[in-house]
């Protein structure tokens, strides 16, 4: 009997405003003769700022403290992130306790934890001059968080929808990719809920520990271009796929996403000895995460969500494919741009720009990060998360 190896795979993607008070220009014991000319009623409060007690906690998905997380608080200005109000770092207990001065009218602000693995740009209400929230934790976030600042990813692609009935136990649908005739068959690995979160999640999910998160953040610093800081990650000889060397069960675990799009993630397989040379060689794609978006950020995924891909024979290669902004609120639209872990299948005319994922190793786990925008487009940040 062949032994089976467990091959887990993780996916990854200060300003104080001075208060203003009116100064009396006359002797308070000798008021003006014409009080009718006063510009405000008695008791009017001219104070325009307030001091807010801030308590922000950063936790892993198993509620363990994350220290050293940079946290910024911004004003909310017409639905977008405005002026920086305060900046700080969580302590050894994963807590940022501080006082922040902000405009008196502000009842909702933007709190951004610049740390992969934690939801970013959350909307937090202030109540009784306190701002209290937890970023991370088993549910993704808690406290006075009322939502997430939504970036404008545009509407999902509506072409070539794969209906939910086309699941692994309900048949397949044959369609094309990136406008190329392929007759590729699409299906879902399992059913999913109304927000595109798979129903076939493993219980319990995986713990995403502090050490792993720190490694991810050090390896893939957000808003840093991978070609500049780690060109070796996308070198021609860099691994981008999962090559099964002995019979193995394979799982994939969601860690983080920082996309403005509602992306769908799928996988395909082929014999390692005969890699695909064109899109027509991709005969079948199974969707793992119909909507790979975090809870509160146009989705319902939480860090640690784990799905079993299946059992694979030695000599099999597993490739990943991301369909850009393909979740339409109900199904996946495969008319969207598809970006593959096999770089030669990607649409950029310049072959030097075709790699769209990085493949790193952490202990016995592989970490995968995807760039979800065509790399020849000006809007691509090239951070691969």
Task: Please place each PLM-identified region on the residue numbering.
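Bacterial Sec-dependent N-terminal signal peptides
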Residues: 7, 13-44
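N-terminal processing/targeting junctions
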Residues: 8, 17-18, 62, 260
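Extracellular distal adhesion/interaction modules in secreted or cell-surface proteins
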Residues: 29-384
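Bacterial N-terminal signal peptides that target proteins for export
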Residues: 1-8
């Amino acid at each position: 009997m062949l032994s089976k190896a467990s091959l887990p795979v993780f996916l990854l993607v200060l300003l104080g405003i001075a208060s203003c008070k009116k100064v009396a220009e006359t002797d308070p014991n000798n008021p003006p003769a014409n009080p009718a000319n006063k510009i405000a009623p008695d008791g009017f409060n001219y104070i325009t700022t307030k001091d807010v007690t801030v308590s922000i906690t950063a936790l892993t998905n198993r509620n363990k403290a994350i220290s050293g997380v940079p946290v910024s608080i911004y004003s909310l200005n017409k639905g977008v992130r405005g002026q920086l109000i305060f900046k700080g770092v969580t302590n050894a207990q994963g807590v940022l306790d501080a006082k922040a001065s902000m405009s008196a009218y502000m009842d909702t602000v933007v709190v951004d934890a610049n740390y992969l693995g934690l939801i970013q740009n959350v909307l937090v209400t202030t109540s009784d001059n306190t701002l209290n929230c937890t970023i991370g934790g088993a549910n993704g976030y808690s406290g006075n968080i009322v939502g997430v600042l939504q970036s404008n990813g545009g509407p999902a692609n509506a072409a070539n929808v794969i209906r939910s009935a086309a699941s692994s136990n309900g048949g397949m649908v044959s369609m094309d990719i990136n406008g190329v005739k392929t007759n590729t068959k699409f299906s879902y690995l399992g059913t999913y809920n109304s927000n595109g979160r798979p129903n076939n999640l493993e219980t319990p999910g995986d713990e995403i520990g502090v050490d792993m998160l720190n490694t991810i953040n050090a390896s893939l610093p957000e808003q840093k271009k991978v070609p500049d800081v780690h060109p070796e990650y996308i070198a021609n000889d860099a691994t981008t796929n999962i090559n099964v060397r002995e019979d193995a069960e394979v799982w994939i675990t969601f860690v983080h996403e920082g996309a403005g799009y509602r992306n769908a993630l799928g996988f395909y397989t082929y014999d390692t000895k005969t890699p695909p040379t064109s899109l027509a060689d991709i005969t079948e794609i199974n969707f793992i995460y119909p909507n790979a978006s975090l809870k509160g950020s146009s989705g319902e995924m939480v860090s640690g969500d784990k799905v079993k891909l299946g059992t694979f024979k030695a000599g099999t290669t597993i490739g990943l494919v991301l369909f850009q902004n393909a979740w339409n609120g109900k199904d996946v639209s495969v008319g969207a741009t598809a970006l593959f872990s096999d770089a030669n299948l990607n649409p950029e005319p310049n072959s030097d720009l075709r790699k769209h994922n990085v493949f790193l190793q952490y202990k016995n786990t592989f970490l995968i990060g995807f760039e979800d925008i065509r790399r020849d487009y000006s809007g691509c940040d090239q951070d691969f998360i």
